[in-house]
From Swiss-Prot:
Cross-referenced NCBIfam families: RNAse_H_YqgF
Main localization category: cytoplasm
EC top class named in words: hydrolase
UniProt GO molecular function: nuclease activity
Top-level division of the source organism's lineage: Bacteria
Gene responsible for this protein: yqgF
Organism: Shigella dysenteriae serotype 1 (strain Sd197)
This protein's UniProt keywords: Cytoplasm, Hydrolase, Nuclease, Ribosome biogenesis
Annotated GO biological process: rRNA 5'-end processing
HAMAP family per record: Nuclease_YqgF (MF_00651)
Statement: the UniProt record of this protein carries the keyword Zinc: no
Protein name: Putative pre-16S rRNA nuclease
Disulfide bond residue pairs: none
Length: 138
């Protein structure tokens, strides 16, 4: 086991991506993947898996603040199931509440409104999801 994990912040237009190391508990953003109504270019995901060879994949699970599911929750689950089905890699879902808010805040502090492009926000959210996963001791 390499200790490498990939995280995805699922969205219908853009899917944020991050790579992280279990040993350091840190993650960094990778370029976001464009999606057509939630469907990514599966060839890009396959290339990411070949390049990084993750032990597992973490997919952010969008929930309402009270923990109930929202319309995007089922689609994120479906995305996670498709990754597992296509590539046979372990996939776990992780609560992503407020990850986008935190990502926007951090990017804004770094570069103002110009830093808030959609792909950067989505991949920064994926970093937050993965680091949160590490912080919970996984």
């Amino acid at each position: 086991m390499s200790g490498t994990l990939l995280a995805f912040d699922f969205g219908t237009k853009s899917i944020g991506v991050a790579v992280g190391q279990r040993i350091t508990g840190t993650a960094r953003p990778l370029p976001a993947i464009k999606a057509q109504d939630g469907t990514p270019d599966w060839n890009i995901i396959e290339r990411l898996l070949k390049e990084w060879q993750p032990d597992e994949i973490i997919v952010g699970l969008p929930l309402n603040m009270d923990g109930t599911e929202q319309p995007l929750t089922a689609r994120a689950r479906k995305f996670a199931n498709r990754i597992h089905g296509r590539f046979g890699v372990d996939v776990k879902l992780h609560d992503e509440r407020l990850s986008t808010v935190e990502a926007r805040s951090g990017l804004f502090e770094q570069g103002g409104y110009r830093a808030l492009n959609k792909g950067k926000v989505d991949s920064a959210s994926a970093v937050i999801i993965l680091e949160s996963y590490f912080e919970q001791g996984y």
